[in-house]
């Protein structure tokens, strides 16, 4: 069975963090460059606030764990998310050049990670900036590239890697989905063993972590 799905699921935010790390630019300056290159939308909120990655990890975790996971349940602890009716993820808008310098001094980089994991105590999912060092396979995933790491109890770790932002990668993904839907009308991606019952996630305070 699959116990964990995690990774860098948004090419826009990864491009921004990569440029802040390699070139020392501030968030706003790199965001403008990303928009000029077509990597970021004119309204980038869905990307930079983590909403896009949140929806993606909800889908991937649902498929991996065999139960429906509501993206609105992922890492919710602020009243603002309730008022806006949006998932309360931690995006990258508050990441500063100083944060990047501290990460470098610790031999790490900052990545916006989406994580879905199930344990003996229950399942949880979250999207937030994380400091990772070179021992992590996602450390060297830079620019507009995405990577998804899957951990299975039999296969161990496997990683899938590719471009996640830009006109051609986006168009390719959309067209592939349309073609798949047209070739297989009336079917879904949910296979045997799927349970539409909503999977309740562990509260934030029970999620293990370290600083």
Predicted regions: what they are:
Residues 1-18:
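A contiguous active-site-proximal alpha/beta segment in oxidoreductase catalytic domains
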Residues 4, 16, 111-112, 126, ...:
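Structured core elements
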Residues 17-21, 162, 172:
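Short acidic, glycine/serine/threonine-rich loops at helix termini
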Residues 20, 30-140, 145:
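Substrate-binding/catalytic subdomain of NAD(P)-dependent oxidoreductase enzymes
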Residues 122-124, 145-147, 155, 208-211:
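Active-site lining segments that contact anionic ligands and/or coordinate catalytic metals
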Residues 156-158, 162-168:
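Glycine-rich phosphate/pyrophosphate-binding beta-alpha loops
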Residues 173, 178-211:
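A conserved regulatory-domain signal marking ACT and ACT-like small-molecule sensing domains
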């Amino acid at each position: 069975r699959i116990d964990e799905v995690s990774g860098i699921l948004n090419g826009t935010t990864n491009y921004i963090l990569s440029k802040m790390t390699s070139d020392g630019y501030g968030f706003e300056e790199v965001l403008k460059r990303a928009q000029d290159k077509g990597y970021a939308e004119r309204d980038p909120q869905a990307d930079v606030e983590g909403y896009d990655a949140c929806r993606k990890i909800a889908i991937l975790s649902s498929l991996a764990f065999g139960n429906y996971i509501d993206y609105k349940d992922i890492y919710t602890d602020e009243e603002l998310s309730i008022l806006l009716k949006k998932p309360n993820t931690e995006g990258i808008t508050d990441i500063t050049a100083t944060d990047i310098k501290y990460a470098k001094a610790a031999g790490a980089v900052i990545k916006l990670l989406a994580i879905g994991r199930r344990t003996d105590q229950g399942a949880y999912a979250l999207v937030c900036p994380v400091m990772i060092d070179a021992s992590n396979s996602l450390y060297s995933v830079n620019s507009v590239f995405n990577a998804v790491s899957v951990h299975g109890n039999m296969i161990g770790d496997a990683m899938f890697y590719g471009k996640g932002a830009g006109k051609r990668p986006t168009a390719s993904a959309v067209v592939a989905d349309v073609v798949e839907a047209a070739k297989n009308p009336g079917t879904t991606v949910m296979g045997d063993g799927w349970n539409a019952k909503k999977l309740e996630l562990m509260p934030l305070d029970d999620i293990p972590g370290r600083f």
